[in-house]
Amino acid sequence: MHCLQVVIAIVLYSFGKISAENANCKKCTPMLVDSAFKEHGIVPDVVSTAPTKLVNVSYNNLTVNLGNELTPTQVKNQPTKVSWDAEPGALYTLVMTDPDAPSRKNPVFREWHHWLIINISGQNVSSGTVLSDYIGSGPRKGTGLHRYVFLVYKQPGSITDTQHGGNRRNFKVMDFANKHHLGNPVAGNFFQAKHED
């Protein structure tokens, strides 16, 4: 009976019906994160190396879970919770990006960043400097599923950046990470969304 409960929890979790806390996200191993990032092409479309940990992202009672599908209406507003395994006193960068703009078949605007915050103290997102305010997903009709990727980078120190934020299209998170010596992302997650009538 216990095995059946675990299977049901995993299925519900993968469809975003229950929170990460209830589904025991300690099961999200580096191998699972790496596998999902490669299976969905985030490696190599967005990053060259998958993060080793999960960033937990919730929109009210819906949880982002390694490629589950959410609607633009469900993610219209900024997430209600964003957390990751942070080191006390460390600074972090959080980015949400869409590599499928305007479509996955024709990503001429790759990437379109939807949210960019630097100098986050620990995992206190509100303590960071917002370079780009949050914009929810909004795929155009006929463009299919888009991947919306959350990445967290540990910073080597405080960042001063005035060049990013205004122009959202053709943003390259790897270029941003290289410019600021961020290395590979320490945590990540993603959902998918398509046009909603």
Curated annotation (Swiss-Prot):
InterPro entries: PEBP, PEBP-like_sf, PEBP_euk, Phosphatidylethanolamine-bd_CS. Coiled coil: none annotated. The keyword Aminoacyl-tRNA synthetase does not apply. Residues 1-16 form the signal peptide. The keyword Glycoprotein applies. Hypodermis, cuticle and uterus. Keywords: Glycoprotein, Signal. This is OV-16 antigen. It comes from Onchocerca volvulus.
